[in-house]
């Protein structure tokens, strides 16, 4: 099924049909919708290889995630990967998972960049001072950070207000009368972990309370379980526990 047939049926040019199907922003939403509906009705599938040659794209996005801790054991992370993959697939774009070891001399994501094997990168579990983002920014390669970092220039990022979450939770417990409040936090320097820890600590300082029940533990159920046992065995155990991830909560 050719573009000419779609163009003839809709009474528009082949160029307009092509630009609509390839996502150009100079095509109106109404025209794009008509073209996509007609293409779907006819079972039209674009020649992906030809489109890649013409557009100079790979039609692939890489998702960079750390080897340690193992985020693939986290159901929330897996759900996020599934949603990203689903949305990209709607635009005929593949998602490549790239495990990155920050202790390695060479990084897989840079091989992808240098070999032009992806069009862009999504970098998950960012660090507060992240050399990966700095390297990508210096190279001019397009990326989206899932988390915030300290970079010299503005960059695209998506994140939750991690600081506000633990700060509000801690304040709520204080208002309920708790004075010995624990936090089970992950034991690494990823940006969201530091933000959650700081929210907890600042809320305690506001109330003049001790942070003696702060614990940094592996992001596993066992880590949460063992840390909770240790806290409950203290002469003055906490009366409330905040966890910064679902696996800690399961263990607690």
Name every feature range the model reports, one short phrase each:
Residues 26, 30, 48, 52, ...:
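Residues at secondary-structure transition points
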């Amino acid at each position: 099924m050719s573009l000419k047939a779609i163009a003839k049926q809709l009474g528009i040019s082949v160029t307009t049909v092509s630009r609509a199907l390839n996502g150009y922003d100079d095509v109106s939403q109404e025209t794009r919708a008509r073209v996509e509906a007609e293409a779907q009705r006819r079972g039209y599938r674009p020649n992906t290889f030809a489109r890649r040659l013409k557009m100079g794209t790979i039609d692939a996005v890489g998702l960079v995630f750390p080897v340690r801790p193992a985020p693939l054991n986290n159901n929330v992370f897996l759900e996020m990967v599934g949603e990203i993959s689903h949305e990209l697939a709607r635009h005929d774009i593949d998602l490549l998972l790239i495990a990155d070891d920050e202790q390695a001399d060479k990084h897989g994501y840079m091989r992808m960049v240098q070999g032009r094997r992806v069009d862009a990168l999504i970098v998950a579990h960012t660090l507060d001072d992240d050399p990966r983002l700095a390297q990508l920014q210096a190279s001019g390669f397009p990326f989206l950070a899932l988390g915030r970092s300290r970079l010299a220039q503005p960059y695209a990022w998506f994140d939750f207000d991690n600081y506000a979450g633990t700060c509000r939770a801690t304040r709520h417990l204080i208002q309920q009368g708790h004075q010995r409040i624990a936090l089970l936090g992950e034991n690494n320097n990823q940006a969201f972990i530091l933000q959650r820890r700081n929210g907890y600590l600042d809320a305690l300082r506001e109330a003049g309370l001790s942070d003696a029940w702060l614990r940094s533990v592996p992001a596993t159920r066992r880590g949460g379980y063992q840390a909770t046992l240790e806290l409950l065995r203290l002469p003055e155990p906490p009366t409330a526990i905040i966890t910064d991830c679902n696996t800690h909560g399961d263990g607690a």
